[in-house]
Regions:
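Glycine-rich, small/polar surface segments that engage phosphate groups of diverse ligands
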Residues: 1-67, 71
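Alpha-helical scaffold segments in soluble metabolic enzymes
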Residues: 21, 25, 56, 60, ...
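C-terminal binding/interaction regions
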Residues: 63, 68-125
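Generic structural signal for well-ordered, non-membrane alpha-helical segments
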Residues: 15-19, 50, 54, 86, ...
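A generic structural signal for short coil/turn motifs at secondary-structure boundaries
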Residues: 45-46, 81-84, 132-135
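Short alpha-helices
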Residues: 16, 99, 108-165
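Residue-identity detector for glycine
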Residues: 3, 8-9, 17-20, 30, ...
Length: 165
């Protein structure tokens, strides 16, 4: 699961998992307000213990005033599937985003799951090898977020090595 971001009329970016790097890049290179809810382990464990895993992200977002100006960026291999009980927390965040009118974008694989089914803009990484779906997907996700944040319309601050001449 990745993030929610305030991007000019689009609100905060939130991230979990490998998307933490995306949140860092959005903040550092693009000056976007972006968050990684699972970076606060104390709050995460308190929420899991008291509320359950499936609602950890959505309840965290509610405290962050999640609204229709926000965009949820999902990085997931399967995109969430309630029937198979896989990444139900992602499904719940996507459901809430759609309910309040926030945008849902993502990079997923396989059939894309619930994220692909209802998302506003979702890329599906093609399966090159059924034995390497997860590493290929996560590798492509990193390429895609780096291409996104380095786009001239989004990147306002230079990367380190490019800034040294």
């Amino acid at each position: 699961m990745a993030g929610v971001a305030h991007m000019g009329g689009v609100s905060p970016a939130v991230d979990c998992g490998p998307g933490g790097w995306l949140v860092c890049d959005f903040r550092k290179l693009g000056n976007f307000e972006a968050y990684a809810p699972y970076d606060n382990v104390s709050e995460l464990t308190a929420r899991v213990n008291d509320e359950g895993w499936d609602v950890t992200i959505i309840n965290w977002l509610k405290v962050s005033r999640f609204n229709s100006k926000d965009c949820v960026f999902v990085f997931s291999v399967g995109g969430g599937n309630l029937e198979k009980n896989i990444s139900a927390n992602i499904v719940k965040v996507v459901q809430e985003a759609k309910r309040i009118g926030a945008k849902v974008v993502g990079v997923v694989a396989k059939d894309g799951g619930y994220t692909k089914e209802v998302g506003d803009a979702v890329l599906v990484v093609p399966t090159l090898s059924s034995e390497r779906i997860t590493p290929h997907t996560e590798g492509f996700q990193a390429v895609i977020w780096h291409l996104l944040i380095s786009h001239p319309k989004l990147q306002v601050n230079p990367t380190k090595w490019e800034s040294t001449k």
